[in-house]
Amino acid sequence: MALLCYNRACGQRFDPETNSDDACTYHPGVPVFHDALKGWSCCKRRTTDFSDFLSIVGCTKGRHNSEKPPEPVKPEVKTTEKKELSELKPKFQEHIIQAPKPVEAIKRPSPDEPMTNLELKISASLKQALDKLKLSSGNEEDKKEEDNDEIKIGTSCKNGGCSKTYRGLESLEEVCVYHSGVPIFHEGMKYWSCCRRKTSDFNTFLAQEGCTKGRHMWTKKDAGKKVVPCRHDWHQTGGEVTISVYAKNSLPELSRVEANSTLLNVHIVFEGEKEFDQNVKLWGVIDVKRSYVTMTATKIEINMRKAEPMQWASLELPAAKKQEKQKDDTTD
């Protein structure tokens, strides 16, 4: 009876009677996800694509392992005894201080003002990174022309959840059992969006059998630009608001950031084929002429000068409440 191997990155079924010391190729380390890069702690290869990460061939040989790893132990949470409400109250006398009336807001400019492209300042680190990418991409194109569409023996299937490798022409006729969705990691749980079988163990997640049948995908076709989400945050000082977009190797000639006094439109092309778009209705008012964009190898910083040195409650202006609108309609 064939057993499932639980070694990381293996997931093959094996016969215990024929199991040998070099039958399994696996990763003895743990998965590492850092700054959008994915890899294993036991080897140096890194990738930004999750399918490529799953297809990274193991770096160690050994025996197949049929023992399922134990679930991670959850910490025991002990609750203290409930205390009387009087004990939780502060031991000093409370004084309620009335807040001062808010300063009257300045008149907000119209959002229909013409948009202006902000100045792009390109760092030396980004220029060096793009020069290296151009050299490597040129070598890859030459290599692709030589290889044409030939599939090499041992190539892993690019479908999510499939661990099969190309063995020859017979592999073209095999049925592929894979996950058609995308991997989701949320609050310690791991699962595929297509079938939602949740687990907290990464090895169990990798060993989940696919829920869709089809053909193997041995090569990835170029689908052109792909709009993707990108991690971003913001901070402010007395006179500036800065938005940081963590997109690596952005392309200045294809990217743009435009704004007027109250609106900001961001379009960034990075890593050759990825796009990030974000439109922001700003909470406050900015001075467009004194605002600019700094592009580095690891991120883009949008530096916006405040029209007045005041604290912003948030980056975006909240949408008007529907209830207030309905109330106004009924009073008319």
Curated annotation (Swiss-Prot):
Protein residues bound to Zn(2+) 4: H179, C194, C195, C211
Boundaries of every CHORD domain copy: 5-64, 157-216
A Pfam family recorded for this sequence: CS
Region of interest: Disordered: 62-82
Binding-site residues, Zn(2+) 1: C5, C10, C24, H64
Record PTM Phosphoserine, positions in chain: S51
Name of protein: Cysteine and histidine-rich domain-containing protein 1
Phylogenetic placement of the source organism: Eukaryota, Metazoa, Chordata, Craniata, Vertebrata
